[in-house]
A protein has these predicted regions:
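Short loop/turn elements that form and flank the Walker-type P-loop nucleotide-binding site
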Residues: 51-52, 88, 113-115, 148-152
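Hydrophobic positions on the alpha1 helix immediately C-terminal to the Walker A/P-loop
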Residues: 69, 73
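Hydrophobic anchor at the beta1->P-loop junction of P-loop NTPases
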Residues: 56-58
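A short, basic N-terminal segment
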Residues: 1-52
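Walker B catalytic acidic pair
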Residues: 122-124
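Conserved glycine(s) of the Walker
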Residues: 63-66
Length: 170
């Protein structure tokens, strides 16, 4: 599983904070550096630098910073691993759950998603629960998540669904 091990947890927390702030500024807003926001950033830094499961689910109500934090994580990884800071080249592929559902009808594209080393799926729960593909009913997001989990691939997911809704749907 991917772990950031060249920098300390405190360094990563600082990088994430800067990336989060940049994401907010790009939307022409001001960052609210309250305790909940800073706690989420700190927990993300802990996850990125520790020996935890390879998946991160960020869920909750609309507008609480899920996608902003996920983008900050992606941006931080991109800066640290796709620049002069590293000989390794790593980046996180970002896709919406709706795009995953559309992609399912193209086996080659869907296989590429399954095999991405690092993937961020935004807004699960907005896609159709199941679709018809070649006459078969499939649940693309569920299939993708199970496939990635089985192979312990780095996956970040955001959703506006609550615990119960996530459990019922996935």
């Amino acid at each position: 599983r991917f772990i950031i091990d060249r920098w300390s947890e405190e360094d990563i927390k600082g990088f994430l904070h800067l990336a989060y702030k940049k994401e907010v500024e790009e939307r022409r807003s001001e960052i609210i550096e309250d305790e909940p926001t800073m706690t989420k950033i700190a927990k993300a830094a802990t996850w990125l630098t520790g020996d935890y499961k390879p998946g991160l689910l960020l869920y909750g109500g609309v507008g609480n910073g899920k996608t902003t934090l996920a983008k900050a994580i992606c941006k931080t990884i991109g800066i640290l691993y796709d620049s002069a800071y590293s000989n390794e080249r790593k980046g996180v592929c970002r896709i919406s759950a709706l795009e995953v559902a559309k992609c399912a009808s193209d086996p080659e594209s869907f296989t590429r998603l399954r095999n991405q080393e690092m993937l961020f799926i935004d807004d699960i729960g907005t896609e159709p629960a199941s679709i018809k593909s070649w006459g078969n009913e499939i649940s693309p997001v569920t299939e993708l998540l199970y496939s990635r989990y089985d192979r312990q691939l780095f996956t970040i997911i955001t959703s506006n669904l609550n615990d119960k809704e996530l459990e019922e749907r996935y």
